[in-house]
């Protein structure tokens, strides 16, 4: 085989795999948790159609939080009981200090049967994006 044929064949394979890996850009219709950028999270908060949950400790929540947010402490002994009481059909937005606890909380919420959880990450990023903080 010629070197040119091999080069073209490799190029064609790379192109096929690259096209196959492309995302359509459409939101997934699968229920569950997904990460949103701070700006998108602020837009969701401003729309007022999501229940906003702060999964930090009560002490952290008392220092500053998003206006109207519920405080359900991820590390609290009753976290699982509190999320079990949430309406699984409601859309939720969760956040914490840095994004680590919100990711864990979002997965636990999915496990509890909640279908729509936007993980907004950390409060500092949300504040910089214009979230209403009190």
Residue ranges of model-derived segments:
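Rhodanese-like catalytic fold shared by cysteine-dependent sulfurtransferases
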Residues: 2-50, 62-91, 100-134
């Amino acid at each position: 085989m010629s070197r040119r044929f091999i080069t073209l064949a490799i190029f064609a394979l790379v192109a096929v795999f690259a096209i196959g890996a492309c995302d359509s850009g459409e939101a997934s219709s699968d229920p569950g948790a997904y990460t949103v950028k701070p700006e998108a999270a602020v837009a969701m908060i401003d729309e007022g159609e999501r229940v906003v949950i702060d999964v930090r400790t009560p002490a952290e929540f008392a220092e500053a939080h998003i206006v109207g947010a519920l405080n359900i402490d991820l590390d609290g002994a009753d976290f699982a009981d509190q999320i079990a009481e949430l309406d699984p059909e409601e859309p939720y937005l969760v956040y914490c200090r840095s994004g680590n606890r919100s990711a864990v909380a979002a997965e636990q919420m999915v496990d509890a049967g909640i279908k729509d959880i936007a993980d907004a990450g950390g409060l500092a990023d949300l504040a910089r994006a214009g979230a209403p903080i009190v």
